[in-house]
Amino acid sequence: MEDLYLSWPKWFSEALARYSSLEGALEGVEEIYYCGMGGSGAAGDYIEALLSIYAPQGPEFRVVKDFRPPRPPRHRGYGLVLASYSGNTLETVECGSLLSPAAGRVVAVTSGGRLLEMAKERGWLVARLPGGILPRVSFPWMLAASTAMLSGALGVDLEALKRLAGGLDTQGLKGEAERLAGFISRYRIASLVTCGPGIPLAVRLKNELAENAKMPSRLEIYPESSHNDIVALEAAEGLYGAVFIWIEHEGSLCPAVLDVVEGIYREYGVDTISIESSARGGPNATVAEYLSRTLVFGLASVRLALMRGFNPEETPPIDKYKRRLGEALRSQA
């Protein structure tokens, strides 16, 4: 799988070119719902974080990782993105069935399946994904499609972003991944510590560790975790190491918060490693940073899988869940 992750910069640049026809597809919409599960939902998390940095007065962007949103839309005519690599994700198909009738603009991000059929039947826009790859490895295509749809709100120049992504130093990133994997391999559990716009990165690392390396992890999101999770340090020494995920940006208190937390971790004898990024270079650079950090996490998780004796491609519990959920829903129909 390493070769697939190392292809990401090339794929992302290709995807930006492929999806240029979607540029601005969701501009001017005040409310946007993004329905997607697992790796397909991850791109929505990243776009939500990017909007919080570069378009705080922009559209309300709601990521739905369920059969339906927790609250129904307030107005008709909202934007809707339905992301499912296979096109058959039950939760996403159901979310689309519920939300599409009142939506003003709908985009299906998929390689095929039921979602593509629905798009053709109902005249939705489609960001067609390449087939034959693992869903979680399709992340650069998902991110490129979503970025193109909201390039204006994000302040992204697709041509400039294409050049930035294509110039990423994959060998340097591979070295970072090896260091991260070596650190995490010393512990039974990884503690992932972050704040603000680092949250989608930490969630992605958690998921990559689970799917590829079959390794449990714990997620601490600050400042909230300072009121609960941090107390586990009392019994943490030797049990877990901590990965601190920083994204510095103008006006953020997160760097100060994480600096304090890292000091406390060390007082309790817990080893730490930092993954640092910056949003000060503008939206193009930040999207490229998100892509590069996520690539590092993918490579590190594959390396960990091999160190731990697991096949990173296989996910038997997910297969069982999908099969049994389908059976359960059919029995209720």
Swiss-Prot record:
Statement: the UniProt record of this protein carries the keyword Protein biosynthesis: no
Family annotation (Pfam families): bact-PGI_C (PF10432)
InterPro entries associated with the record: Glu6P/Mann6P_isomerase_C (IPR019490), SIS_dom (IPR001347), SIS_dom_sf (IPR046348), SIS_PGI/PMI_1 (IPR035484)
Catalytic residues in the record: 211, 227, 322
pH-related activity note: Optimum pH is 7.6.
BP term (GO), one: carbohydrate derivative metabolic process
The SIS domain, residue ranges: 22-160
EC numbers for this chain: 5.3.1.8, 5.3.1.9
GO molecular function: carbohydrate derivative binding; glucose-6-phosphate isomerase activity; mannose-6-phosphate isomerase activity
Matches recorded under Gene3D superfamilies: Glucose-6-phosphate isomerase like protein, domain 1
Enzyme class: isomerase
Catalyzed reaction equations: alpha-D-glucose 6-phosphate = beta-D-fructose 6-phosphate; D-mannose 6-phosphate = D-fructose 6-phosphate
Binding annotation for D-fructose 6-phosphate: 39-40, 84, 86, 89, 136, 227, 322
PROSITE patterns registered for this protein in UniProt: SIS
Activity regulation, per record: Inhibited by low concentrations of erythrose 4-phosphate and 6-phosphogluconate.
Lineage top rank: taxon: Archaea
Keywords: Carbohydrate metabolism, Isomerase
Temperature effects on activity: Optimum temperature is above 98 degrees Celsius.
Similarity comment text for this entry: Belongs to the PGI/PMI family.
Protein function: Dual specificity isomerase that catalyzes the isomerization of both glucose-6-phosphate and mannose-6-phosphate to fructose-6-phosphate with similar catalytic efficiency.
NCBIfam families: G6PI_arch, PRK08674.1-1
Subunit structure: Homodimer.
Name of the protein described by the UniProt record: Bifunctional phosphoglucose/phosphomannose isomerase
Native species: Aeropyrum pernix (strain ATCC 700893 / DSM 11879 / JCM 9820 / NBRC 100138 / K1)
Gene: pgi/pmi
